[in-house]
Amino acid sequence: MIKRLPDDFIFGGATAAYQAEGATTIDGKGAVAWDRYLKDNYWYTAEPASDFYHQYPIDLALAEQFGINGIRISIAWSRIFPEGFGEVNAKGVAFYHSLFAECHKHHVEPFVTLHHFDTPEALHSRGDFLNRENIDHFVAYAAYCFKEFPEVSYWTTFNEIGPIGDGQYLVGKFPPGISYDLAKVFQSHHNMMLAHARALVHYKEQAYPGEIGIVHALPTKYPLDPTNPADVLAAELDDIIHNKFILDATYLGQYSEKTMAGVKHILAENGGSLDLRPEDFELLQAAKDLNDFLGINYYMSDWLRAFDGETEIIHNGKGEKGGSKYQIKGVGQRIFDVDVPRTDWDWMIYPQGLYDQIMRIKADYPGYKKIYITENGLGYKDTCIDGRIDDDARIDYIKQHLAVIADVISAGANVKGYFIWSLMDVFSWSNGYDKRYGLFYVDFETQKRYPKKSAYWYQQLAATKTISV
């Protein structure tokens, strides 16, 4: 069967500043919390990553050669404002002007994110977005970038508000490494959504000609037994933590009664309270209809069953399949032993979950306008033999997900593009350099790029816009 994607569809590749650039201490860049945290807690650092800071002309030439017409890039906040606010770093500004010019030279449209997990250390150490002062600093940084970089037509404020809060305060694998604090998770999500809303309102008030949105990671949640009300509730509660709380803030400007009932239940079981103010909701209401697009990062779905025990989360960071555990008191337990394939990192491969998630957005948040799939891809332990990388599993993964995107477009959803994670191999926040996602293999010792088999497949896809399934 042949499925076709629209003629104006973006076939993109995604990157992130800290995961790709390297150059973490040169040309005036300020520190981020990850710099010290990686040295203290992991077996790798962000040096040299993919050395995108110096190699970007090569990467963009490859993008053009292989038919990629869009790229997700994030600006490193601390490369513009080393302390998060105050004095501007001219060398950082010049770098991004050069980078965006190179994008346009190669006919690759930059979709630019302002924050991709990398708050400057000077602000992170003061509480990051748990501190409401950080909202002011982020909005000032955003306003500066909107004005300074008119060559950017597509902006996103944040990448994955959900996983930021989860990583920092639930799983505890992101700095500051706090575990099982659900109140901090929700408060971080809420405050970051306020920062998004203020930046969004500012962008529209200034009447900039481009478009602006936000990127959410949206793993679909299913009950292990759909006929068991307790399992259904477990899936709904996990969905509130990871998806619905931030989606309500984005498109409703408030938290629905059902969402807040779930939040109150979770906090009653786990402790803590939230600081939600009337003026917060005035701001969210002012912003809810201004998003030009929603970016969805989708990798996996989860199956939940009811659970009465204590919270325990074990993160599988080394690709040892079966090493994960995820159970939250009063919420539920994720079950990995279901009839669905999974990666070595226990990520469940379920393309139907992307279809279901998009249709949920269409039904529950009809003001969404349009969607880009801003990240999707397969983490794999690729091997390079004489410059050849056969990654058929990645091709199959991408093909399956693009097929359901074609289906969901046929069902009436407005999906305008797809950005594979990642354009080239980058370092993974909590998995290091062994977990590769790129279309282009990076030899991290030499920084030489090698197109994988998937790159040639993607090139053909971009040319024909058809998928054979």
Curated annotation (Swiss-Prot):
It comes from Streptococcus equi subsp. zooepidemicus (strain MGCS10565). The active site is at residues 160, 375. PROSITE patterns: GLYCOSYL_HYDROL_F1_1 (PS00572), GLYCOSYL_HYDROL_F1_2 (PS00653). Pathway: Carbohydrate metabolism; lactose degradation; D-galactose 6-phosphate and beta-D-glucose from lactose 6-phosphate: step 1/1. GO terms for biological process: lactose catabolic process via tagatose-6-phosphate. Transmembrane segments: none annotated. It catalyses: a 6-phospho-beta-D-galactoside + H2O = D-galactose 6-phosphate + an alcohol. Keywords: Glycosidase, Hydrolase. One of its GO terms (molecular function) is 6-phospho-beta-galactosidase activity. It comes from the Bacteria. Its EC number is 3.2.1.85. D-galactose 6-phosphate binds at residues 19, 116, 159-160, 297, 428-429, 435, 437. This is 6-phospho-beta-galactosidase. SUPFAM superfamilies: (Trans)glycosidases. PANTHER family: GLYCOSYL HYDROLASE, LP05116P. One of its GO terms (cellular component) is cytosol. Signal peptide: none annotated. Belongs to the glycosyl hydrolase 1 family. It is an enzyme of class 3 (hydrolase).
